[in-house]
């Protein structure tokens, strides 16, 4: 799965953003589990998932800050 551009992430609604964050966190959990049981073959997915999660959390944080300052 290709990493989405930040402009695509900012277009998501708040609910879609929360769902995507939950989805990426579950994926990271599954990747950690596979690594612990030595079943992981795609180790590059860790980096991609962490970067994508960071992007999503950044957008969510920006929205929360803009809502509280308004």
Curated annotation (Swiss-Prot):
Organism superkingdom: Bacteria
Keyword hit for Thylakoid: no
InterPro entries xref list: Ribosomal_protein_uL29 (IPR050063), Ribosomal_uL29 (IPR001854), Ribosomal_uL29_sf (IPR036049)
A GO BP entry: translation
Pfam families associated with the record: Ribosomal_L29
UniProt key word Magnesium: no
Entry GO MF terms: structural constituent of ribosome
GO cellular component: cytosolic large ribosomal subunit
Keywords (A to Z) from UniProt: Ribonucleoprotein, Ribosomal protein
Family: Belongs to the universal ribosomal protein uL29 family.
Record PANTHER family: 60S RIBOSOMAL PROTEIN L35/50S RIBOSOMAL PROTEIN L29 (PTHR10916), LARGE RIBOSOMAL SUBUNIT PROTEIN UL29C (PTHR10916:SF0)
Protein name from the UniProt record: Large ribosomal subunit protein uL29
Organism: Prochlorococcus marinus (strain MIT 9211)
Taxonomic lineage: Bacteria, Bacillati, Cyanobacteriota, Cyanophyceae, Synechococcales
């Amino acid at each position: 799965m290709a990493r989405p551009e930040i402009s695509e992430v900012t277009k998501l609604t708040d609910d879609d953003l929360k769902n995507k964050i939950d989805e990426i966190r579950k994926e990271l959990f599954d990747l950690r589990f596979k690594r612990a049981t030595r079943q992981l073959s795609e180790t590059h997915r860790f980096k991609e998932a962490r970067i994508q999660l960071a992007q999503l959390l950044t957008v969510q944080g920006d929205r929360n800050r803009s809502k509280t300052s308004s």
